[in-house]
């Protein structure tokens, strides 16, 4: 059986849809990676997070910053997030926590965006 032109076009469309990454999200992820070293870090918090609100997995974040950081605010706005409504810190360059992580695990309660590059509502455990 010979493949028809319709079969070929359907296969091409599926391949393009699967392999294409949203350019906007890719640009935002790159921007987060770029600013991670420029943001003002958050000091250790004196409050203990409610562990029942932590989203699994616990994360290892390159840095934590305030949601109102002027460098980060445009990225949050691009994602439709109002920084003033975030409770806790914003984690940058996050990935699932392992024993090899150089920082304490992060409890993030609100979201894990851009493939872990950005996490909201974070605090150190």
Curated annotation (Swiss-Prot):
UniProt superkingdom: Eukaryota
One GO cellular component term noted in the UniProt record for this chain: fungal-type cell wall
Any Pfam family the entry gives: Hydrophobin
Signal peptide region: 1-20
GO molecular function, one term: structural constituent of cell wall
Induction: No expression is detected in sporulating cultures, nor in vegetative cultures or during infection.
This protein's UniProt keywords: Cell wall, Disulfide bond, Secreted, Signal
Cell location: Secreted; Secreted, Cell wall
Keyword Signal found: yes
Disulphide bond pairs: 54-107, 60-101, 61-94, 108-122
Subunit note: Self-assembles to form functional amyloid fibrils called rodlets. Self-assembly into fibrillar rodlets occurs spontaneously at hydrophobic:hydrophilic interfaces and the rodlets further associate laterally to form amphipathic monolayers.
Similarity section: Belongs to the fungal hydrophobin family.
Swiss-Prot/TrEMBL domain comment: RodG contains a signal peptide and the conserved Cys-pattern. RodG shows a class I hydrophobicity pattern, but an unusually short C5-C6 region for class I or class II hydrophobins and unusually long C3-C4 region for a class II hydrophobin.
Role played: Aerial growth, conidiation, and dispersal of filamentous fungi in the environment rely upon a capability of their secreting small amphipathic proteins called hydrophobins (HPBs) with low sequence identity. Class I can self-assemble into an outermost layer of rodlet bundles on aerial cell surfaces, conferring cellular hydrophobicity that supports fungal growth, development and dispersal; whereas Class II form highly ordered films at water-air interfaces through intermolecular interactions but contribute nothing to the rodlet structure.
Protein name (Swiss-Prot/TrEMBL): Class III hydrophobin G
Recorded name of the encoding gene: rodG
């Amino acid at each position: 059986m010979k493949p028809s032109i319709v079969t070929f076009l359907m296969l091409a469309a599926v391949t393009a849809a699967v392999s294409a990454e949203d350019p906007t999200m890719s640009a935002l992820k790159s921007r987060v990676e770029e600013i991670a070293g420029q943001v003002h870090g958050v000091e250790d918090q004196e409050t203990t997070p409610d562990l029942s609100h932590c989203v699994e997995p616990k994360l290892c974040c390159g840095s934590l910053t305030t949601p109102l950081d002027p460098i980060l605010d445009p990225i949050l706005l691009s994602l439709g997030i109002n920084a003033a409504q975030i409770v806790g810190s914003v984690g940058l360059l996050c990935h699932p926590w392992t024993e090899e992580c150089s920082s304490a695990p992060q409890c993030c309660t609100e979201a894990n965006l851009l493939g872990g590059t950005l996490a909201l509502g974070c605090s150190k455990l």
